[in-house]
Every structure is written in structure tokens, then in C-alpha cells.
């Protein structure tokens, strides 16, 4: 609430209390979090706070902005979509982030999930195979003041070994099988959240402990297919998005 002091005749002053301007998108965002995320079982207060703060309408095309706070995926161009908010929150919560972690994201898309991760982790490295999306997301994140996320245009199948190991890995497209390089780049006690499958997909949480891995399926999902599984072919070094 803002306060305004107005001068009156005779040297007196009048103190008025004024409500701050209503931010309609903030209201919609808060309503989305309460109705579509918290009410469906997401409990981590840091995740809920990040979902309230990251403006989804700035990560979708202008024609889709009016639908930004509906709990559904939206097209972002190049045949790709931005995930529904509940799935973003659910996958993020599965990483158990405390703010000290280094996270790898495969599939930057518009950068929305990247921004949510950046609000919760120390550093986020994100790979997008489509150069045009990588460039747009990188510019968008910089414009919005997000300084702890780095986006590259590359094939995510090989991960980003230069910055491994990662405390968390989050994959936003579904391969038929879990890419071995991503398993190798997961830190001890690290967690990977990844949709796996073809027509029928399951969201899996992989946890590394010592030399072994545990795997559990947590949710049936439907993601776009993983593109660029280049196993057995030379893999170019990641190129920073511009």
C-alpha cells in the first residue's frame, strides 16, 4: 500500500493511503498457483514462490499471452510447446533444490522452465537443439535480468560434460531410452527428472548413489519427442547462443 501526503490550507497536511496499482498478470499467476499447482499437491514453498514470481506470459508468443496462466501447454513455434505450469512445478519439485545446486536442463524451449530453475538453483546450464529457440531464450533471459542461466545451441543427448557433474538434470523432451551420457554426468546423490517412452511415456526420477542408480516412475506424461539422439556420431562442442 502506497501513502501520499497532500498539502492543505494553513500549513496542514493530509495523509492518504492508496492501494498500489493492480497487476492483473500477478493476480492470474497467484490464482494459477493456488488452483492448479498447490491444490494438486505441490508443497515445496520455494517451488510455489518461484511459480508465483516467474511471469509465464513473457515466455509465450504474444498471440498466446492471454492463455499464459491456463494450466496447459502452449505452442511456442518450431513445432515445440511450453509445458503446462503444473508439470513444470512437479518436475522442479522432484529435483529437491535448495539453492546450492548446479543444474543441467535439456530442452530450453522458450526459457520458462529455465527461469524457474534459475530462481531455485545456483547455476543452470540449458541446451536447446534448435538454434532459433536457443537464441530467443538466451536473449529473453538476459532481458529479464536472469544472470545465473546459460543457454547453448547443441544436441542435448551428450549433455554438457565441461560443466559436469550436475546435482540435478531436468529433461523436457522424451527419448525412447535414458541417454547414457546424462547418467554419467549426474553427480553422486544427484537427481534426474526425465520423461521416457514413445506413444506411452512415464516421467522417471533417477537418483545416483555411489556407482549405482535407482529409478522410479512417478507420473504418466506426454512430451514432445527427444530430438538429436546422436549416439555413435561425432558430437560438436556446444556453441553459446547469441
Where are these regions (language model features)?
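Bacterial N-terminal signal peptides
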Residues: 5-15
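A broadly tuned, weak detector of single residues within folded domains
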Residues: 11, 44-45, 84, 175, ...
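Class I SAM-dependent transferase core
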Residues: 18-104, 115-116, 120, 135, ...
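Conserved nucleotide-cofactor-binding alpha/beta core module
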Residues: 96-210
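A short, charged
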Residues: 236-242
Amino acid at each position: 500500500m502506497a501513502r501520499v501526503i497532500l498539502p492543505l490550507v494553513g500549513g496542514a497536511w493530509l495523509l492518504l493511503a492508496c492501494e498500489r496499482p493492480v497487476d492483473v498478470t500477478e493476480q492470474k499467476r497467484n490464482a494459477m498457483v493456488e488452483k492448479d499447482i498447490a491444490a494438486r499437491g505441490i508443497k515445496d514453498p520455494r517451488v510455489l514462490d518461484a511459480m508465483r514470481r516467474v511471469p509465464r506470459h513473457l515466455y509465450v508468443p504474444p498471440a498466446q499471452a492471454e492463455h499464459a496462466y491456463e494450466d496447459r501447454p502452449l505452442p511456442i513455434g518450431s513445432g515445440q510447446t511450453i509445458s503446462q505450469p503444473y508439470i513444470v512445478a512437479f518436475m522442479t519439485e522432484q529435483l529437491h533444490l535448495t539453492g546450492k545446486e548446479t543444474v543441467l536442463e535439456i530442452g530450453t524451449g522458450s526459457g520458462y522452465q529455465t527461469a524457474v530453475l534459475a530462481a531455485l538453483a545456483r547455476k543452470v546450464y540449458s541446451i536447446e537443439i534448435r538454434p532459433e529457440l536457443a537464441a530467443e531464450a538466451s536473449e529473453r533471459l538476459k532481458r529479464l535480468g536472469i544472470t545465473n542461466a546459460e543457454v547453448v545451441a547443441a544436441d542435448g543427448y551428450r549433455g554438457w560434460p565441461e560443466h559436469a557433474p550436475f546435482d540435478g538434470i531436468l529433461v523436457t523432451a522424451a527419448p525412447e531410452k535414458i541417454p547414457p551420457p546424462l547418467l554419467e554426468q549426474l553427480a553422486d546423490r544427484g537427481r534426474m527428472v526425465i520423461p521416457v517412452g514413445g506413444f506411452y511415456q512415464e516421467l522417471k526420477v533417477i537418483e545416483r548413489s555411489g556407482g549405482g542408480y535407482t529409478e522410479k516412475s512417478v507420473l504418466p506424461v506426454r512430451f514432445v519427442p527427444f530430438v538429436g539422439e546422436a549416439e555413435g556420431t561425432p558430437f560438436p562442442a556446444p556453441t553459446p547462443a547469441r
